[in-house]
Amino acid sequence: MITDYTNIIYDHFSKRVTRATYQLDKEQNYLMRLATPLSHYPYKNNNLMIIYFKNGAGELQWKDKRVKVDREKFIVTNPSIGWEYVNPKSRPIDVLCIVICEALRKQFHYFESTSTMQQLDNPFGQVNIDSFFLEEPLGAAHYKSGKLLQRIHQFSNESAFHLTDPEELSMNVLTSIYQDQYHGYALAKRVQAKKPSTQLETFKRLLIAYEYIHDNINNPISLEELARVSLLSKFHLYDSFKNVYGQTPHQYINRLKVAKAKEYIQQGENSIGEVADLFGFNDIFVFSKLFKKIYGNPPSYYQN
């Protein structure tokens, strides 16, 4: 049983092991693990693909756009005429990759778009709906679907992984990503703009600010900093963030800091003062007041 994927490509569906890339069959599903140097890989006429980068980096190139990917990120690519992964320095990548064939994708869309009665009357129906997934790299730690990919990747290093059913794993991931991104589209509609395309582009930039906050929560984060990384003006960022998330960036940052601080306090390894300092609260009185405002109890209530 394979638990070390160094310099190989393993497909959980076929149990195939190779040392070189190969063209994927349009009619097949794949759940692949690879930990190998890879300079490039062209995927022409591609199926829906979900890629989680545990380690490594590179760039996905379509005809009309390019997207950089990095460690602990995942991305969903919609069916299209194809794209190419490029890694000029051929640095090793550690990747979990799930490919959903057209038939399974249509079955999934049928399940999501029809009533229970319709599914009982026609249990094997299919619906051909254009995939709507955001083709943007997302931090795995910040989304339920990303955390699921992390768990599957971790489990794939254990011998018991080979007892799992790859189709069920793929269906689980597809459902989770659909729920996350459906929720994302609902949030995008809160952006004050007339055109859906403008709402979506603004939301994509807000996601950059959102992930930046989560990745740097132990550091001071200014509105100017968020505006710079998201390529939104301060006013546009402030207004759109408030409409989408129901609070200003500053309020969101403080709530997240306090939530993380609560976790540290419950672990019992640091004093309340040390935890407050860790998250940038220099005045323990201010920290305790904000903490009680959010949770209704002082920090000491959560000490073991």
Predicted regions and their residues:
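Alpha-helical structural elements of signaling/regulatory helical domains
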Residues: A140, E158-F161, D215-N218, Q267-S271
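Hydrophobic residues in alpha-helical segments
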Residues: S156-S159, I177, I213, I253, ...
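An amphipathic alpha-helical interaction segment
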Residues: Q126-P196, E201-K204, I208
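N-terminal regulatory/effector-sensing and dimerization cores
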Residues: I2, T18-V127, Q154-T164
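Basic/polar phosphate-binding segments, predominantly the helix-turn-helix DNA-binding elements
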Residues: Q179-G184, R190-L200, I208, Y212-V258, ...
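N-terminal presequences and immediately downstream first alpha-helices
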Residues: M1-D11
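Hydrophobic recognition helices of helix-based DNA-binding modules
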Residues: F108, V173-Q181, F241, I265
